UniProtKB/Swiss-Prot annotation:
Biological process, per Gene Ontology: cytoplasmic translation
Entry keywords, A to Z: Ribonucleoprotein, Ribosomal protein, RNA-binding, rRNA-binding
Assembly information from the UniProt record: Part of the 50S ribosomal subunit. Forms a bridge to the 30S subunit in the 70S ribosome.
Function summary: One of the primary rRNA binding proteins. Required for association of the 30S and 50S subunits to form the 70S ribosome, for tRNA binding and peptide bond formation. It has been suggested to have peptidyltransferase activity; this is somewhat controversial. Makes several contacts with the 16S rRNA in the 70S ribosome.
Gene Ontology CC: large ribosomal subunit
GO MF term set: rRNA binding; structural constituent of ribosome; transferase activity
Originating organism: Beijerinckia indica subsp. indica (strain ATCC 9039 / DSM 1715 / NCIMB 8712)
Name used for this protein in its record: Large ribosomal subunit protein uL2
Positions with biased composition (Basic residues): 209-220
Annotated family: Belongs to the universal ribosomal protein uL2 family.
Compositional bias annotation for Low complexity: 36-49
UniProt-listed InterPro entries: NA-bd_OB-fold (IPR012340), Rib_uL2_dom2 (IPR014722), Ribosomal_uL2 (IPR002171), Ribosomal_uL2_bac/org-type (IPR005880), Ribosomal_uL2_C (IPR022669), Ribosomal_uL2_CS (IPR022671), Ribosomal_uL2_dom3 (IPR014726), Ribosomal_uL2_RNA-bd_dom (IPR022666)
Gene it is expressed from: rplB
Length: 279
């Protein structure tokens, strides 16, 4: 998909750059594969704000995506590629040989009419899903499971991919986009190829209103607030905050390590931080 620019007849159109979605299906999603979705506005079940600067936006219908791909050894044909407001990638509607319909994350180079299949050992081509242990070293993958049968958890955003770089005693070493190398069980499934819509990162929203359509409210800095609202707030006139940068809850930000899950440290072969320092 290409990027789309506009004749600058207004200030917002001058900087607006969006992904050209003219090739996508223009109708409604399959009703049996959708469900309602209520907007939380960034609030939890107590009604308290847990994610700031969220709210409003266009109403969305949730599309049920098959992240498990456990309908093994049954070919499916790609019926159409669709837009999904709930994620940055595009989705593909596939029809299995027994006429069952399903949505999957669309990888790059997947076209209408293509055939996809999932199984323990299948052809290495975009859209096919199989166990990591059976993939050749060097394969580009996405939709990676972290626990066997739980469904894809990693590498699902637009344009992302990981690479199988080695094997180690029933585990597979996968290099992620961040540079991190991680051990994942060989029986975890992954899908061949990179995720669709790589141009998403080059889009420019163009105006504040488009951000509001996406459900994003204005993001204001702590240093512009009052002392009651943020540790950086207050002061006479403009101030620098007067302390090292912290979150609204007083925890150090900008570089402070926050990872505490020591039980899974053994699965990280190379930290993403170390790989950056080497570069």
């Amino acid at each position: 998909m290409a990027l789309k620019t506009f004749k600058p007849i207004t200030p917002s159109l001058r900087q607006l750059v969006i992904v050209d979605r003219s090739n996508l299906y223009k109708g409604k999603p399959v009703k049996q594969l959708t469900e309602g979705k209520s907007s939380s506005g960034g609030r939890n079940n107590n009604g308290r704000v847990t994610v700031r600067f969220r709210g409003g936006g266009h109403k969305q219908t949730y599309r049920i995506i098959d992240f498990k791909r456990r309908k093994l050894d049954m070919p499916a044909k790609v019926e159409r590629i669709e837009y999904d407001p709930n994620r940055t990638s595009f989705i593909a509607l596939i029809r299995y040989a027994d006429d069952e319909l399903s949505y999957i994350i669309a990888p790059q180079k997947l076209a209408v009419g293509d055939e996809v299949i999932s199984g323990q050992q299948v052809d290495v081509k975009p859209g096919n899903a199989m166990a990591l242990a059976n993939m050749p070293v060097g394969t580009i993958v996405h939709n990676i499971e972290m626990k066997i049968g739980k469904g894809a958890a990693m590498v699902r955003s637009a344009g992302t991919y990981a690479q199988v770089v080695g094997r180690d005693q029933g585990y597979v070493i996968v290099r992620l986009n961040s540079g991190e190398q991680r051990l994942i069980h060989g029986q975890c499934f992954a899908t061949v190829g990179a995720v669709s819509n790589p141009d998403h990162m080059n889009a420019s929203i163009g105006k504040a209103g488009r951000s509001r359509w996406l459900g994003r409210r204005p993001h204001n800095r702590g240093v512009t607030m009052n002392p009651v609202d943020h540790p950086h707030g207050g002061g006479e006139g403009r101030t620098s905050g007067g302390r090292h940068p912290v979150t609204p809850w007083g925890k150090p930000t900008k570089g402070k390590k926050t990872r505490t899950n020591k039980s899974t440290d053994k699965f990280i072969v190379t930290s993403r931080h170390k790989s950056k320092k080497k570069g």
